Structure formats: C-alpha cells, structure tokens
Amino acid sequence: MFYDILDYPWERIYREWRPWLLGDLRGKVLEAGVGTGRNFQHYHRSVELTGVDLSDVMLRKAARKVKKANCKIELLHDDASMMRLVDSNQYDWIISTFLCCVMPDEFQPMALQQFARVLKPGGKFRLLEMVYSKNRKIRRRQDLFAPFVEKVYGARFDRKTVQYIEESAELEITGKRFLKDDVYLLIEGARKV
C-alpha cells in the first residue's frame, strides 16, 4: 500500500499508457518486476500471465489484485536476472515497466540473457524505462531529484539498458520511442530467430 501511495503522482501519468502498452498482448506473457500488480487489469482476458518479482512484499500486494484481473495469473518469487523458476522457450512476450532503471547495471546483461532464454524464438519484449533527458532544463530537474528517486525507489536515470540490448547476441531492438518528454523510453524488441 505504501508504495502505491508514494507512486501516486507518477501513476497519474502511467495509467494513461497502460491500456495500449498491454492491451494488445496475447498468448503467454511474462511480466518481469511485476511489483504490486498495477498492470493486471489491462491485460486481455486471453493472456496467460506469469508475474516475477524479487520482493515478497510486492508479491503479496500483487496477489490481492489477481482476483480483479481479467486473465489467468501465476506469481513467482524469483530474480529477473536468474529466473530459476521459469522454463525456457515458453513466452510470447516479456513486459517490464521500470524494472531496468532499478536493476543495477551489473545484473542487466544477466536479466537480458534470461529474457532471451524464456522467450520463444521470435518472441517479443516491451520495456518501459526512465532515462536522463537531453533537454538541459529537464536534466537539471532530474539531477535535483535523482538522489531522492534512487533512495526511495532504487531507480536511476543513467542505466545502460539500450546498450546492453544492442550488445546482446540473442535480442534485438525493433523500436524505441519516448512517451513523455525524452525521459520515459519505450524499448520494443524480439528474440532473434
């Protein structure tokens, strides 16, 4: 509950994106860093969703939202950089919203390897992340709030997610676009066939 309250000012922005970010997905979907389950209500009823999170607290909160969801959901306590409980070649989609900006850089290549392992050949991914702006005015504001954002949310604007995907032998980026200013970056891609 505390996290959802703390995140409320930003959620007013994110809630506009969730329906189109998730609503067109079909098949087996893995949500890495499922958090408190805020995305659940936006998945199509045909989706078979597996939600993975490292935090027991977040998973307990997410479990309360499963009943209100349209689709079948399984929650797993697992680390996105290891995914010991997730079988290979199973998923049509991987979704994560703000996972990589909270994941330390040293774990991101491992997480991306896991994404490639659990996706079916040609399976797709969609990652929504926060990055540093190139606009000086916005960047100054980000610099001012960066210590707070890192302390409270564990998020950083300087993660190298795009670089790690580009360096991956198994994943490729098929599209990148900003959803608001040049801070909220949507990265779309696929497992190479």
Stretch-by-stretch model annotation:
Residues 153-169:
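Short alpha-helix
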Residues 81-94:
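A short acidic, Gly/Pro-enriched loop at the edge of an enzyme's catalytic core
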Residues 109-121:
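A short glycine-rich, Lys/Arg-flanked "PGG" loop and its adjoining helix->strand segment in the class I
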Residues 93-107:
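A short SAM/SAH-binding and catalytic strip from SAM-dependent methyltransferases
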Residues 122-130:
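Conserved beta-strand signature within the Rossmann-like core of class I S-adenosyl-L-methionine
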Residues 30-83:
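Class I SAM-dependent methyltransferase SAM/SAH-binding core
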Residues 1-26, 38, 142:
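Conserved class I S-adenosyl-L-methionine
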Residues 169, 174-193:
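Core SAM-dependent methyltransferase catalytic element
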